[in-house]
Amino acid sequence: DHGENSLAAKLREIARRTGIRIVGPNCLGVMSLRTKLNASFAAAAAPAGDLAIISQSGAVAAGLIDWARAHHLGLSGLVSVGDMSDVNFADLLDHFALDASTRAIVLYIESITEAKRFLSAARAAARVKPVIVVKSGRHYEAAKAAATHTGALAGRDAVYEAAFRRAGLLRVNGLDEVFAAAETLGRVRPFNGKRLAILTNGGGLGVLAVDGLLDLGGETAKLAPETIEKLNAKLPSNWSKSNPIDIVGDADPQRFTDSLTETLADKGVDAVLAMHCPTALSTGAGAAEAVAKAVAAHRSKTLNAKPVFAVWFGGTPQLDAIFATARLPPFATAADALRGFMQMVRWRESRDALMRTPPDLPPDFKPDPARARRAIRQAISEGRQWLDQLEIVEVLDAYGVECASSVLATTPQEAAAAGRAYLITNGAVAVKIASRDITHKSDIGAVKLDLRTPEAVEEAARDILTRIPKLRPNAHIEGVTVHPMIVRPHGRELIAGIGDDPVFGPVVIFGRGGKAVERIADAALALPPLDLDLAHSLIARTRVRRVLDAYRDVPAADMDQIALTLVKLSQ
């Protein structure tokens, strides 16, 4: 029960009155590993380290503790927040962002209640350290279960995605990805670039890893000629001579040491994935120790050491211990390792985006919010939930968004007069019902297109004004609107608008438009306000972006104008 007279409400009142902070209720508890505090009922504590976990689910928190113990991964702290009657995500993000013993933060979220506080704290934390978030309830049934669990409204998952992106958080979609991220964050410091070299004693494994890397948006490193020359001197003549670096199935430990040392020294390499396939000629432990030796030597020579990710097939506790001592992240599969690598790349890109200076808006962009508010207040004073079409044009024009002109006509004769004026400069006009109660006009035949004479306009208006009131007797009908037909032989139909989310508030929507917009479902969301860079990023996340460039006899769309329109809408 979360109502005003619930036990949770009484608990909050006592906490406010006494100055006591409360974690929970309905939670696993709290751990601070460095101070040896264990105020939880977890089966066992995790080892001390520098990864913080904040979880809305006690079961997920318990699972992460058990996984951390099994993988020798240390935690700086763990808080199971439960129903968050007092202490919430924002409080804990603020704490761990300033905690010198925490290098990265993992969040498990089912719902958010104070969106503005959360986003502010998340943005501040993501600027200084990686923040990984897994959000359950991506589908309707799961979101409903999460809302029942936490007593909070879940909101649309696409809006959560937009909020996480704007705050610089790195989202993953399941606990397996959380584990991969935690393995990486616990042992790898942030690095520059995304050029990965793949080192392996099995050629097929290397080829599969390249496919996986490119699928995730990564980039294979191109070995420098001098690196290839040095490797030629130390490897058998049948090595691959390129990336992936196949050092051949009979590779002994020294071959792993030599090849990794030269690869790490290459300025065109940002990180290395080292993989080992067990053979009768090559033991896993010996190769692992050789890799650990090369990594230690590399770290001793530079402050900005390049990360090395390890995949040893046929893993054993002995191998885990070798990698843990060397602070190398080991993974069961190349897919897990590549996800971990790309998560670090994506976090760095998100952090860089948070730190950049937004581009200036055009000097002639001078919005008139007061004019827009007048139109909206008029609708509110009349108890309406929708603006009519002319009011919408008024609001958009106040923010510099160009709209096709239109005229409201209350009779067929007025419509004919408006059509006659438009037909002087346009080949055809359109007539639509004017009603704040009818949103999908074409569904009921309330749109007439390609009208080329005043008589045709008059007849279309008469038909609409006679027929639609019978179909929708409860709808308030102001008349019809007359518009010039805008014909673009190579035009693309797009949608741009503002939605309202119950958790995060206004969101900007962009995507493919048209009557089938819901069926096609090609849209992306972003939190306002936008600048030009953010608007271009929003456009790039849609499939329709691919057809906005020039192709065959179709000219390119004006991407800067589309982006500027989104910026104006977001204001």
Residue ranges and their predicted role:
Residues D1-Q571:
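Catalytic-core regions of core metabolic enzymes
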